[in-house]
Amino acid sequence: MLELADWRPEDIKIQASKVSNTPLLQRPPPPLTSPLPAHPSTTVATPPPPIPNLLSCHDYKGGYHPSESAQGQFPAPPEPIYTAAHLHLISTFVYFSHNLVSIPPSPWINTLHRNGVRVLGTFIVEHHVGSTALSRLLDKGSEGEYIFATQLALIAETYGFDGWLMNIEASFPGESFRPGELQAFLRELRSAVAELVPGGQVIWYDALTVLNQVHWQNGLTLLNAPFFAVTDGMFTNYGWREPQLQATRIMADSMNRVPDIYTGIDCFGRGSLGGGGFGVGEALSAIWRAGTSAALFAPGWTYEHFDGKDFETVDRRFWVGDGGDVEGSSVKPVSYFVSEKACGGSEFFVTNFNRGFGKGWWVDGIVCSTPRAHTPTPCPADIKGFV
């Protein structure tokens, strides 16, 4: 927390490559009557609309890999890298690690912003170590402002991303915890982010309750609603079942904020309905019926679980299917339940088909180097790219 308190925007002048240079592309609004997937008529008389928003929480092997650096990785190891290829389904991307403050690498921000995807960093405090950080979180400055709300908003503005996932998985120390004070902090953080970052958001994670206990509610309840009320959304824990989900829907509807609930699914299973993996469709089906948004935690499962083998095929099957009969299959991909978002602008779409990694480096048709190279960002126009 001391390092966070001492941070200043001018500190990154010598690290300009770590700052995003791409503003968030504004996606065109959806048509008034969005086309619906052909859901089975036996489910409901009139199918509900697709899941409104999908959050992808990028928890991948601890984060901050060489291939994610601004300069990429060159020469690169022979195995493929994890990339996010189905951005037309994603509304918000969270870069997650177990550091206190996780700032998304600039290549991720640039790539996602080009496709209209909002990018959030993560502020996380965990276990007994987290209580030490929480002892200072609500510190105020000389003018009564919350010091760390100001700092987090400035970091988002400086690095060019769009806000924060606030994940408090520890109790505040002592007996003086007051939920109203944490609410005031979150309200100020939300206001500061909105002022400094156009379209910025703060999303609360379902862990800490108003009783100062880490007690995952697996939905919206009276114990976490006060924190949801002062943020832009809530990412629920993954252990819910349909009765809890329906109760969440009813409570969120009373607040007129159903789409602001991001019902969580752990892609590795770990208590999620459907068991994660290709079974996420079972959880998404329940979310689809309830009408909330959804959040996928660790979709890098498509790479990690298979050690990168046949990654593109596995990832495609997870997100959009393998081209077979989706209606007749018990295993349905993410795209079956989620509304597609436009990629590109309302009047343009541009691609050079450069995926940012390949078997060598070519410039003007001439081989410059044959070792593999990796970067999550497609090459800029002045670099002809990978093949």
Regions inferred by a protein language model and the residue ranges of each:
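Chitinase-like catalytic core of GlcNAc-active glycosidases
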Residues: A45-Q246
